[in-house]
Amino acid sequence: MSGFLIANALLFLIVTAYAVYLFVYLVKTRLAYIKLGQKEQFDQRFKERLHAIWVNVFGQKKLLKDKKSGIIHVMFFYGFILVQFGAIDFIIKGLAPGRNLSLGPVYPAFTFFQEIVTFLILIAVGWAFYRRYIEKLVRLKRGFKAGLVLIFIGGLMLTVLLGNGMNLIWHEHGLSWSEPIASGIAFMLSGVGKTGAAVIFYIAWWIHLLFLLSFLVYVPQSKHAHLIAGPANVFFNRMESAGKLEKIDFTDETKESYGAGKIEDFRQSQLLDLYACVECGRCTNMCPATGTGKMLSPMDLILRLRDHLTEKGAAVTSRSPWVPAAAFRHTRGNQLAAASAGSGSQEAAAALDYNPSLIGDVITEEEIWACTTCRNCEDQCPVMNEHVDKIIDLRRYLVLTEGKMDSDAQRAMTSIERQGNPWGLNRKERENWRDEAPDAEIPTVKEMKKEGKEFEYLFWVGSMGSYDNRSQKIAISFAKLLNHAGVSFAILGNKEKNSGDTPRRLGNEFLFQELAEKNISEFEKNDVKKIVTIDPHAYNLFKNEYPDFGFEGEVYHHTEVLAELVKNGKLRPQHPLHETITFHDSCYLGRYNEVYDPPREILKAIPGVQLVEMERSRETGMCCGAGGGLMWMEEETGNRINVARTEQALAVNPSVISSGCPYCLTMLGDGTKAKEAEDQVKTYDVVELLAQSVLGADLKMGEKQ
């Protein structure tokens, strides 16, 4: 037996060492691929980053947003960590028969706990198999590769239970309460005898070891690389406000292009995202573009970028992405690596001719322009991948480097550049909306200065509030409520320009920066300390992105100011409305800035209002379809996003659909018309409803919206 044990131990060391070598090689290879990206500075905010690890890795916070899948993953995650101690115990039993993990009197409790955890993991494997292959959850991939990890995990659990059962027979330990499942197996197979039990034990032991080491090697070259890249991605995730876009330095004369025209143009942290992807499909499941039949799928976008990085990385670094190399010699990645190293077959040399373009071959322009930048994908991602900034970088390349843009979007850009608004209307008519409210005091900054008066808030009206007839009513209602509450404010009037959100989200960073600098100059010239706006897109820009260009000041959304005025009694809702209202969360107010409660607090304060929530609300609220500059583009593929969102609102039988965004309100109003429901269901901004309750203002509930 001693000779066998020596041979067994030597073989164990050789196989384990080879597996560890392959694992390290694969991790270093992926790291080399990631390093092809653009370097970036690390802010060293370790405390916050460790907190993110605690919450999202160990706390599984994002995974538990989907309770069913989340619970399965929690069982896998903690179960797999815990059973590693059992695996060590099992390996010791094979290397030194009769020995085990030295835990003294607590060993029986340890083995009992291990068996319970092992059993729960087997249940989780069965549940996961059911969800993927029988229930056929749409967002989950099927096929052999998708189920291979279930085979690995299930095999590991079954072999350790079988091996422990045989160990009881082999060493005549007898049945034990501390190993109930192994004891059951031992009881059923008691007829095999000691020798037979020893043989079966080592068969199970080696299968277990090979499963374990194969899984170790499989992880870095599969979607399960997220076990390594996921926690790293959470740790290195940007600590800035959600969805904040990187500033382009146009003064850098070394730059030959802007945006991402090739995979190496992405930042290293963006490339880390690609290997962190779990392929869970949660992003795609929530994407408004995917849900309405567009080509864009956030998960597929990440996976195609990942595969492209792997192949490009193999060609550049000469490091084969797949091991054992002999088994994967026919894959493009290994052929590219071999050809790059000057070795390999004719097929490997021919592989060098494969040079797909990032935009066109890997990701299509149609996909790039389908994104509404709503960030529902990012909010759902358990490893904190950022999809939107990659799409914006691709847009930046198309717009700034190649001069490509959708014709409708280009018209809006030209109009903004020439007249400061997307319609190309006269910039000198920007403040004319005040004429629609002769009973309200809506002074310009210039007028306030002329009278020697000061103002607390700069009311940023925005292009919609200034020029769009429907949105002007929102601006007027807000101004009247500020007058009623005694809040001093002023507008820039004709000095106001477009905030720059549309150009920036469409990829025209140059125009955005030009607008931002001019707006900030106007703020500074007029000593602006506080800004309030009815436009969530401008709100997000001023609050989170203008500071990169030198702006310092407080920024508020109008619902935040109104909620506070209601709370402190300066605005008293008194006229009942008797309406059933559902509230639509603007993406740039909600997911980007986590402003969910103020608009709801306002609606709840209005007498007679019954607030009902849509199935998708707050963090999971669906986009109206206007974000990302798509307000100015036609949807030519699939169903209209605004109609899909309107259908979700109509499903809860409201009499009013409310929002806190003029863009959303326009899209939802068009949606009710498309569903021929505009006579039964009206669309109003929160401020209009509050104005009716506080001032008794007649909103003409039956008028055409």
Swiss-Prot record:
Its cofactor is [4Fe-4S] cluster. It is a multi-pass membrane protein. GO terms for cellular component: plasma membrane. Keywords: 4Fe-4S, Cell membrane, Iron, Iron-sulfur, Membrane, Metal-binding, Oxidoreductase, Repeat, Transmembrane, Transmembrane helix. Binds 2 [4Fe-4S] clusters. Residues 268-298, 360-391 form the 4Fe-4S ferredoxin-type domain. Induction: Repressed by FadR in the absence of LCFAs (fatty acids of 14-20 carbon atoms). When LCFAs are present in the medium, they are converted to long-chain acyl-CoAs, which antagonize FadR as to its binding to FadR boxes on target DNA and thus derepress transcription. GO terms for molecular function: 4 iron, 4 sulfur cluster binding; metal ion binding; oxidoreductase activity. This is Probable iron-sulfur-binding oxidoreductase FadF.
